């Protein structure tokens, strides 16, 4: 695995790893080392496998009270600065100048890589039939060869993630990439479940709604709007009842960051050793 990645299940309780302490590539925010480089470098970091997460403010605000989500972020191998709100608050509090690396920017770079586009190299975990149909149609228009066997329809997971059927499929097919497009807060826990229980380590990309902004499954977000930290506004305008309350509640992240800054909120037990394969541990 690329040395820029954090240590995953070998990390300390504050989510540090091989990249920790290097301010050229990481910042420790809320006790988690966030990668602050560019999209191409982030995708390169995942070449050897691992778990990538794209934490957004609506889920990050629960970091102090959602132990499962907190554990998933702690044990991720790469965390990117998708949350514009988190980046703005951090730069204000710390007089820093870190840049945002959005999930959309990461996905555009990832989807341009030949090894992701190779037939059979990627398993796509989709949130439901309607989303899957739109996403697959868009992928095929972009030149991806996606057959039905390449798509897994995620069930409605409970707080305790368990999906032995998915483990069996991945164990048999062994794709290099697993792209998870379900909702934030769930996808990270699913990614950690797979990382701990699969007999090999694929690159697990928890990209959430990023593909939906490209496929039309959700509102299209222009690249200029994404770069200007305005993606949330487009989502709110497209579906106010759904997204306005979500982003309004995300303001709680400000208080969390003022209180904890670079410290991990909540008590977290030491990392557990990966469980043997086959022993199990809301959609967007």
Sequence positions of predicted segments:
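A transmembrane-helix-recognition feature enriched in membrane-embedded lipid enzymes
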Residues: 87-88, 220-273
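Conserved beta-alpha
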Residues: 87-169, 173-174
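Short Gly/Thr/Asp-enriched flexible loops that form oxyanion-binding sites at enzyme active sites
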Residues: 136, 188-197
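Proline-aspartate-enriched helix->loop->beta-strand connector
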Residues: 170, 174-184
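Short glycine-rich anion-binding loops that position phosphate/pyrophosphate groups of nucleotides
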Residues: 57-60, 85, 182-187, 210-211
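Short, flexible loop segments at boundaries between secondary-structure elements
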Residues: 153-158, 201-238
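A short helix->loop->beta-strand "cap" motif at the edges of active sites that frequently abuts
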Residues: 49, 119, 199-203
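N-terminal nucleotide/polyanion-binding subdomain common to many enzyme families
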Residues: 1-8, 14-107
């Amino acid at each position: 695995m690329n040395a820029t990645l954090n240590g995953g299940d070998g990390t300390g309780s504050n989510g540090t790893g091989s990249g920790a302490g290097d301010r050229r590539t990481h910042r420790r925010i809320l006790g988690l080392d966030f990668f602050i480089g560019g999209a191409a470098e982030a995708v390169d970091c995942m070449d050897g496998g691992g778990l990538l997460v794209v934490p957004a403010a609506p889920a990050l605000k629960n970091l102090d009270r959602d132990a499962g989500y907190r554990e998933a972020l702690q044990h991720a191998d790469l965390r990117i600065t998708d949350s514009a709100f988190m980046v703005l608050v951090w730069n204000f509090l710390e007089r820093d100048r870190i840049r945002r690396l959005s999930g959309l920017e990461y996905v555009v770079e990832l989807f341009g890589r030949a090894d992701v586009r190779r037939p059979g190299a990627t398993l796509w975990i989709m949130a439901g039939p309607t989303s899957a149909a739109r996403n697959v149609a868009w992928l095929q228009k972009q030149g991806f060869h996606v057959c039905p066997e390449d798509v897994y329809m995620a069930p409605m997971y409970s707080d305790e993630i368990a999906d032995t059927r998915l483990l069996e499929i991945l164990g048999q097919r062994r794709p290099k990439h697993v792209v998870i497009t379900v909702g934030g807060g769930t996808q990270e826990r699913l990614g950690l479940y797979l990382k701990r229980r699969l007999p090999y380590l694929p690159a697990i990309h928890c990209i959430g709604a990023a593909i939906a902004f490209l496929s039309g499954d959700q509102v299209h977000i222009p690249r200029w709007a994404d770069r200007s930290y305005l993606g949330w506004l487009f989502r709110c305008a497209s579906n106010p009842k759904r997204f306005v309350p979500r982003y309004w509640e995300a303001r709680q992240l400000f208080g969390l960051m003022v209180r904890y800054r670079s410290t991990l909120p909540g008590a977290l037990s030491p990392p557990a050793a990966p469980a043997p394969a086959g022993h199990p541990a809301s959609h967007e």
